């Protein structure tokens, strides 16, 4: 004979948001569960601009691998590629390729969102400015001030968006 414990509250989940970039990649990890959302860690992974492209991509891979081993996320959110300037877009696309490969090596399949989807999820307006999104992140995570740097704040916003869209 056995008993089954059925609970309406989901187990806590560590959700990692990633804001891709070659020079600076933002990351933000939250703990989500019945008690709400709590920040775990956030910051940036940087690659020196004076290094060659292969060296920068290797640094991104190694540092992200280490971060994944430390944080052990259950879910990952990733910003979809957004076109800025052609040169910048190519570098971000190369970084995204490394990010996707690194996630796959850690058996993680990211959920992807456009910047407008993230803004809509946090503020209710898909064209909200950076300040409004950062204020929403601070409010949702009960932070005493706006999260910095901007890339880390964006990554936290992506992680929160994963949580908001968990049943869609």
Curated annotation (Swiss-Prot):
Biological process according to GO: DNA recombination; DNA repair
Which cellular component appears as one GO term in the record? cytoplasm
Q: Where is the active site?
A: 19, 79, 151
Record has DNA damage as a keyword: yes
Q: What are the protein's UniProt keywords?
A: Cytoplasm, DNA damage, DNA recombination, DNA repair, DNA-binding, Endonuclease, Hydrolase, Magnesium, Metal-binding, Nuclease
Record field: catalytic activity? Endonucleolytic cleavage at a junction such as a reciprocal single-stranded crossover between two homologous DNA duplexes (Holliday junction)
Identify this protein by name: Crossover junction endodeoxyribonuclease RuvC
Gene behind this chain?
Answer: ruvC
